[in-house]
Amino acid sequence: MEIRVYNSELDFLGIIENQTSLIWTRKYFEPGDCELHIPITEENLRLTRRGNLLWMKGKKEAAIIEDRKLEESDSRNEITVKGRFLSSYMDRRLIKSTVYFSGKVEEAMRQLLQGVTLIPRVELGELQGFADKVEFQATYKNLLVYEEKLGRSANLGFRFRPDFNEKKIYFEVYRGTDRTMSQGVNNRVIFSESYNNLNDTIYRENAQLYKNVAYVGGEGEGSARVYVQVGEATGLELREVFVDAKDIQSENMTSAQYKAALETRGRETLEGAAVSASFECDTGADENFRYQINYDLGDVVTVKKRAWGITEDLRITEIQEIYEYGGRKIVPTFGTAIPEKIDWSDT
């Protein structure tokens, strides 16, 4: 396996072939990341400068070098490189104008990217035509944070796909394929002990941060302030949260449009505070269902763990490709990973 290195202008710089470890983590709702370990050599020092790009042939993603550590001791002479995938360029941009949008989520994601300060070499990819709709207003928000929110709201993934021949980077929105047992259109994919592809399993579920009713406060003061409620529950099942949405202004909107924008903010908050449940496993040398042939990132598959009484249809939200000791290990995560905390500052 060779790792090709490019500069930020997408010019080819060289090849890394002497790595001891590479962890390439693809993520559906956010930029993926990587961690690379290589020996310290003059050539590797040249290639691993901050801002350079790492890419492997056939990949739809490339990683930006953001962190580099040099370590020398009696037992170690190593460079450790870490970075996020190209879509993290959006973390460098703000939505500075007031954007009011009512329409399809995919088109909103594309419009937000077009409305910020230009990211060099980035262009819109082909429009897929996903029908999911949204209504929202955003001002002075981080572009990447909002793209992630929109993607999660409609179960859409996104990426920056590099084309090193054209020296362009394409923003693509995509949706995984339904491969569950309950459907009959696509080839089914099942992860279970009987298929020997559910090894070293970890299952997590957590409701500590769960909220199911949001009270959203819009513009105005005191009794004149506009409020909307999103969600319903009673008794011990009721878990309430307040969302301050004064940044959403009613200018140039009807009353119905304004309340719809507040409701969208409330739904975003509840989506970020859902019950978390996830499977993580080592697929082993699975010959029944092969990665990127029978299934890929974003697909919805059936996961069965009979000993634990669990059978669920879950989306593959993350896939770790681990390259070590001359081999490759695939570790998918199914479902929603458990957040350490919820950041309410941008809701």
Over which residues does each language-model region extend?
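Solvent-exposed edge beta-strands and adjacent loop segments
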Residues: 1-29, 192, 197-204
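Surface-exposed cap/loop segments at beta↔alpha junctions
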Residues: 41-128
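Oligomerization/assembly interface segments of phage tail-like spikes and tubes
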Residues: 26-40, 77-88, 216, 272-286, ...
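Acidic, low-complexity/disordered segments
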Residues: 74, 81, 219-257, 284-347
